From Swiss-Prot:
It comes from Rhodopseudomonas palustris (strain HaA2). Belongs to the peptidase S14 family. This is ATP-dependent Clp protease proteolytic subunit. SUPFAM superfamilies: ClpP/crotonase (SSF52096). The active site is at residues 106, 131. It comes from the Bacteria.
Amino acid sequence: MRDPVETYMNLVPMVVEQTNRGERAYDIFSRLLKERIIFLTGPVEDGMSTLVVAQLLFLEAENPKKEISMYINSPGGVVTSGLAIYDTMQFIRPPVSTLCTGQAASMGSLLLAAGHKDMRFSLPNARIMVHQPSGGFQGQATDIMLHAQEILNLKKRLNEIYVHHTGQTYKAIEDALERDKFLTADMARDFGIVDKVIDKRAEESAPGPKVA
């Protein structure tokens, strides 16, 4: 049976662009990267995190002041992989706008909230989910205790990040993340994860999710 990821990559369309040196072909994602658009799709794990971080650093080197647009459709994933993306978003100089298409769950919702203030968007039918980190550990009792303490430390840190970006109190975030909390786009806006729900682009020529 063929690897579904390999099958998917084989179906990625190519775009042909006319230049003064003739035709040049790009896969669609590389062409959109030229427009400073990054796609964060699928589970958040080390491989995907490395690619997103590399794209952020590349676009900063290209132009340290021009906005970067990040389109998010992710069920979440590995906390440390997500934090690598988060820290890079805060570290680089260009403002990063975020736009949720489909879903932003778990670490996906944190990265959605991590966009530049007033530049965090959601499409109207997107779903956002927040919750506390989870993990399963095996081994000696002492090791399990150490892992349990580490996940509590991560929980506290993630809560603090949500507090910083949403404007909610720590208690409100702690209560909201106690269980899976599913939000509509409007609810996510009211909660402070996004700034605006958009259903169309104000300027058709603009590559990123800019609105009037």
